[in-house]
């Protein structure tokens, strides 16, 4: 990401680490040698990295421009010293602290020139001894300056091939080691202490890579390894960067290719040596992974050379590059919000008027430049050590000194005795278990209140009546109202002692809902008493007047109201005269309102209001909530008994919970126990559990466990036992298991999950699952725990991808590349001979069209190790007509490459007609051997006979054939200098591997098949199969030679008939139809079908490979279950790789995907053999686990043992392994 652009053609130097409180500063000085000088070119400026700052923080005019700048710390200068090689050939020193103040007078420390008057160029400070400065001049001298005594520099001895010194660089670990590079291709390593050369490095090239013959433009030493360095070669035709390890100085450790022109500057990341920054003449600044040799990307390009690039020593997130475009840019290695900014730029560009577009074109192009983010995490962003708890009871950890992840068992803090007390949530299922548990709680109670609570739990478990609850609080058995005074109470009610619900109904007089108040019952009582005493008191039956003259006006009004049925008016008239008795008597004939009116008036007339009046009023109004809310909470026992006596079943639990909440709010120990009593009586799990959860935090302080965690587990176990028992007693059914939010028991659910984790850590997985089953699946954290336990308890529930068998392939240890271990390989050619084509003795080579070559040979940053021991390849000369054999009647077959015996031509007869019976075709006799050859008959197994020694006098004029991809990767060893058997026959040009499923049509005229280009990515293709052994340019014979035509001195012994007959199999290979019979000779030989294998097993597998697809290409819905993991893992890895690779590799990814789709199509049609699919499954498993060594071993085994079943898709598998390894 571009942070800042400074308009200046300059050379640069970052401030060293530890200077300016590690706030990075960038020194810029005008770059010499550029045209169109400006006044600002002679300014020495200091800039900060703040993108918003558009002016230097300090500058002075030094009246000169610079070849190079260097900045290092100093013992007597807090900001260090800046050194610069001047335009006039001298060297100057400046104080950055004075430059920050723009103090020109005190900024300059000193200026010196070399003794021989040479022009000094490159500079570099010694980081271990900052007083030492190295520089090189245009006469080939390397100078060492001591800034303590700058008047006395000394020069190192001149090299034999002295020329202008382009670069000097001090070693970062050994203070007296210096490297320099000049206009020759040599990099010289110096021992400054001994003032002598230690080593000269140069690269003479290897197979496929040209020699590094240009000048050395830049040298960068590894920050941490004293023997490693990188050099940039000034060769536009072969722009390479070489990394060296001086322990093996004869060959570079790696070759970095990707620049289009020579690199001019190198800078190693100071904090993570994995990264190397380079910039060059192609206007590119690239970042490399030095360990793998691949390019990680490049910063936005410049329109001119990038002359110098440098990683910031104090902030490795920043890099600076200077270009001849007149710009110094500061970049970040991480881009942010690039997509949004580019989208906004594109929208803005589309809205610009056509007339103004070209005026804004530079800014538009700059805003849409490609962004760059480092795809690998730098070392300073990586976590050096870490650990995570795993499941069950595991610790996964890693350390900085190992790339392996360690999995260990976490120490179990739960004692064995405590673990024995763990139980499932279904522990309390019988009455005896509950009773024993409650009795144990009574015995272990620390207070009387706690013991009463345990007794109440026992009573609730036995379905005791409310009378039992009152007895526990010291009250006698509850009785119905008037039980002691009224002898006329129903005997069934008097004898009832079953349940508190029925008892409360009787005590509550049963009919309170309508006219069941005390006064209504009073009327009934009066009526009952009247009827009972009817014999003793008869109603007066004398005559009377309704309106008596002696009655007062009030009495007459009351009488009139009664006659008309207005009882309420009569009652109110009595109350106005304070005739309470009369009003009370009259209200017995009225409704509720009459009775309430009398009751309220009576209550208001009482000067002293006793509590029984308040209670009676609440009872009469059925307002028990009034008593529970307003009575003194210290009398909670009386309130509880009042609730037991008068509350209905529906009212009982809410009223008890309200009373318990009032007690819980007091927050003292005794009140908490009292609240617990009320919650138990109400059978409210929510209130009871919340109270226990509050007690859990304080109960651990009183535990006698050895540790705080042990105390927590102990108290949590007791809580779970209480909750489990309570759920069993009340037969609790949770209605919120399907809820998704607003859970009333959320606190209890969290404890369930925590306790399940403790049980899992102790190995009690079934018990843990029993508690998780009590938690809603949508509760946070529940689903994950259930899934993890399910995987342990039900292994069959794990997806099949995790049941893949482990591969038996061991990783191959990497070998050190040696120059002598790399040998050239001889190309192998392939062709097919048509059994139905008319042959001729005068035939030109077949016009075979090879597969399309790659359009470009650029590697796009993809590098291989250098190949040594093989000369550069030359383009093959045009093919010559084959030389006829001197033997009469012999065929003119040209020997194929890689073979020291004559090829055997097998000409089966035409296919049988309908009238013919199935019979084995006859095998033709092979041609006689040529001069100097020994005849070797074909073997029954179809394998080639080992070749015998060829003459050791090759034709020096024979052109060297280029390698084909098949030959380059062939694992069949061959002699590096194998000449053809005929010294005048040129070596055949290697052709591309021909797929047996393709049929090529012959064309008229003789055409030379061009050699294939070097592939963009070197992969390991499959070796040629048995059907690809013959030469592509082998002319077919005119006829089958008879034994009499053979030389008498050489009599071939034909193999037995059984070995020459094709096997009879139910599945026959696909054979192309013969062409129409024609008497005319074809202009060139037709490409033939593959010969039939001579092994039944190989025939069947080859047939299955070439079998037609059952389903259309691209369909993946019919892949069998046992093969689907192959598809899923390979496809997932392909998608990961395609997102990780840079855009330059898109063609490689596309080709890999196309080849893998061929494999997926065959998996979908289930046409691959079981041995092959087993190997592919093991390969995919290793690749998915990033075990690339094992995956490569399996791929090699597939190619070597099952190669005849492999098609073009094997190249895609091989390439996927390579790409996956490079992007991990």
Curated annotation (Swiss-Prot):
Residues annotated with Phosphothreonine modification: 499
Biological processes, Gene Ontology terms: COPII-coated vesicle cargo loading; endoplasmic reticulum membrane organization; endoplasmic reticulum organization; endoplasmic reticulum to Golgi vesicle-mediated transport; protein transport
Coiled coil: none
Topology with respect to the bilayer: Peripheral membrane protein
Biased composition (Low complexity): 914-923, 960-976, 1035-1065, 1093-1107
Domain of life: Eukaryota
Record-listed Phosphoserine modification sites: 1042, 1044
Keyword match NAD: no
Biased composition (Polar residues): 495-510
Annotated Gene Ontology cellular component terms: COPII vesicle coat; cytoplasm; cytosol; endoplasmic reticulum exit site; endoplasmic reticulum membrane
Alphabetical keyword list: Cytoplasmic vesicle, Endoplasmic reticulum, ER-Golgi transport, Membrane, Phosphoprotein, Protein transport, Repeat, Transport, WD repeat
Cross-referenced InterPro entries: SEC31-like, SRA1/Sec31, WD40/YVTN_repeat-like_dom_sf, WD40_repeat_CS, WD40_repeat_dom_sf, WD40_rpt
Region described as Disordered: 480-512, 840-866, 879-1116
Entry keyword annotation includes Membrane: yes
Subcellular location: Cytoplasmic vesicle, COPII-coated vesicle membrane; Endoplasmic reticulum membrane
GO molecular function: structural molecule activity
Mapped WD repeat ranges: 18-57, 61-104, 114-155, 160-200, 211-254, 258-300, 302-341, 388-410
Pfam entry (one): SRA1
Family statement: Belongs to the WD repeat SEC31 family.
Subunit structure: The COPII coat is composed of at least 5 proteins: the sec23/24 complex, the sec13/31 complex, and the protein sar1. sec13 and sec31 make a 2:2 tetramer that forms the edge element of the COPII outer coat. The tetramer self-assembles in multiple copies to form the complete polyhedral cage. Interacts (via WD 8) with sec13.
Function field: Component of the coat protein complex II (COPII) which promotes the formation of transport vesicles from the endoplasmic reticulum (ER). The coat has two main functions, the physical deformation of the endoplasmic reticulum membrane into vesicles and the selection of cargo molecules.
Protein name, UniProt field: Protein transport protein sec31
